[in-house]
Amino acid sequence: MGYIMDLRKVVGSRPLLMAGANVILLDSQKRVLLQLRKDNNTWGLPGGSLELGENLEEVAKRELKEETGLTALKLEFFNIFSGKEFYYKYPHGDEVYNVIATYICTEYSGVFEKEESEVQDLRFFSFNELPSEISPPELPIIISFKDALFN
């Protein structure tokens, strides 16, 4: 998150537009991989913010690898999410309005290797047994995908 951290040095905690990507990674049982984040103690999808010169698919692949140890062999674009429901205020006070490109991944390789500085736990969940503590800006994404999957 170098670019955003550099901006924070100039603008402080004021709201920023933060473009990024995340990944709905599904196992063979159609369970979704979620990570328990250390910064806000909520579950969410692997993902992060765009760095200078990256495209959104590159962000999705990079963040998946960094946070989980898994390599996406194929990504399928799902949707772009933005708007007031994607506003988030981090526990330390930084505010963002997220613009998130979400990708689906069912083909991947590697073994779990969580990024110790950001991730407490990695776990697959069935869509009928999702944890209650999901990161607020990611909940609408997960619900949207669940609705598309089961309708």
Task: Spell out what each predicted region is.
Residues 81-111:
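Active-site-adjacent beta-strand/loop module that shapes the phosphate/pyrophosphate-binding cleft
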Residues 1-22:
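Acidic, metal-coordinating catalytic segment for phosphate/diphosphate chemistry
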Residues 71-81:
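A short coil-to-beta-strand element that immediately follows conserved catalytic motifs
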Residues 13-17, 92-99, 116:
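A generic structural micro-feature
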Residues 27-67:
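Conserved Nudix-box catalytic region and its N-terminal flanking loop in Nudix hydrolases
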Residues 41-43, 111-151:
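Nudix hydrolase/Nudix homology domain
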Residues 25, 102-106, 123:
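Short, well-ordered beta-strand micro-motif
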